[in-house]
């Protein structure tokens, strides 16, 4: 499938504006392309009990799974800084559903950084391959 990166960037930047981040003031948006061609978005949602905060990337994955999509083609993360890389927890959650995944990081200043899940999380922990297809 050809990846429409512009559409993913626009979706990530749009949802970033909906982020609920009154504590950090650090809004993040994520747009995840499913194998079906659908785009799933997520923003970070913070909480007064700080540890309950959920990142944009995990919200995008969970939204996709709730819609029945478990296979992914690309991810765009839009943040304030030039390089807002997914946190370790989000990398592990992505690895549950992706062997590898091209990831584009987009900063508010327009900086684009290409990376991939395997680059960010080599040797991810998994029980067995493709377990998400049966569960
Ligand atoms: N955050 C994300 O949503 N994604 C990332 O990749 C990094 C961090 C959020 C969590 C928290 O709401 C804020 O950014 C500051 O850490």
Where are these regions (language model features)?
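Histidine- and/or cysteine-centered catalytic micro-motif in compact active-site loops
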Residues: 33-35, 44-45
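Compact, glycine-rich, soluble single-domain proteins
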Residues: 44-59
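Short beta-strand scaffold segments in enzyme catalytic cores
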Residues: 25-34
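C-terminal binding/interaction regions
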Residues: 2-18, 67-135
């Amino acid at each position: 499938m050809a990846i429409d990166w512009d559409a993913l960037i626009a979706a990530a930047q749009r949802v970033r504006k909906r982020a609920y981040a009154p504590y950090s003031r650090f809004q993040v948006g994520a747009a995840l392309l499913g194998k079906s061609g659908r785009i799933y978005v997520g923003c970070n949602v913070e909480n007064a009990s700080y540890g309950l905060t959920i990142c944009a990337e995990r919200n995008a994955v969970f939204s996709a799974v709730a819609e029945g999509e478990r296979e992914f083609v690309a991810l765009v993360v839009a943040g304030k800084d030039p390089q807002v890389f997914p946190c370790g927890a989000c990398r592990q959650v992505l690895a549950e559903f992706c062997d590898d995944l091209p990831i584009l990081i987009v900063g508010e200043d327009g900086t684009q950084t290409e990376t991939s899940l395997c680059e960010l999380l080599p040797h991810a922990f998994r029980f067995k391959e493709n377990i998400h297809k049966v569960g």
